[in-house]
Amino acid sequence: MDSLSFSLSIPLDEDGLLEMECDYCKGRFMLSKKTFDDDNNLDFFCPICGLPNKMDTFYCPEVLEIARQVATNYAMDEIYKQFSKTFKGFNKNGLVKMSMKKPKHVSVSELYTPINEYKMLHLDCCDINIKATSFDDSIGVYCPICGGTRL
């Protein structure tokens, strides 16, 4: 079976950071696109709860929903194309006529805008910037790369 790939643009804030969400604690934070795209970072530590997880588990639900909508629209278009070809051949003999209406696309949600309630934090251990809420900063955050704490 062939594999397909789609590309989505995840919105960045004015500082070039993208909003992420931990799969475990559901805490949100922001990480630079450069850090996120670095192939050396296969796993990240959640800056909020400190638990490690695979990089691709930190997408926000809004981004995952948009990806699902894009994939659904593509699948519906492909199914329609295949059935249309089948019906054309079926309708040639004139005894039975079949038709099919093109399915409506699932509306692709506009990409959300990250909340603007984050505070820029510099983590000296790995020399990176992240954003977390003031509350998370007050109780301490973890470095997403090495897991070290910033209290």
Where are these regions (language model features)?
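Acidic, proline/glycine-rich low-complexity IDRs
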Residues: 1, 121-124, 131, 138-151
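N-terminal alpha-helical interaction blocks
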Residues: 1-11, 68-103
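Short Cys/His-rich Zn2+-coordinating modules
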Residues: 1-11, 24-34, 99-110, 122-130
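Short, flexible, mixed-charge glycine/proline-rich loop motifs
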Residues: 8-19, 34-41, 107-120, 131-137
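Short cysteine-rich clusters marking metal-coordination/redox-active sites
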Residues: 22-25, 46-49, 121-127, 143-146
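Short, non-ligating residues that shape and space the ligands of small metal-coordination modules
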Residues: 29-32, 55-56, 129-135, 149-151
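Cysteine-rich micro-motifs
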Residues: 39-53, 137-149
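Short metal-binding segments enriched for Cys and/or His
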Residues: 48-67, 74-84, 148-151
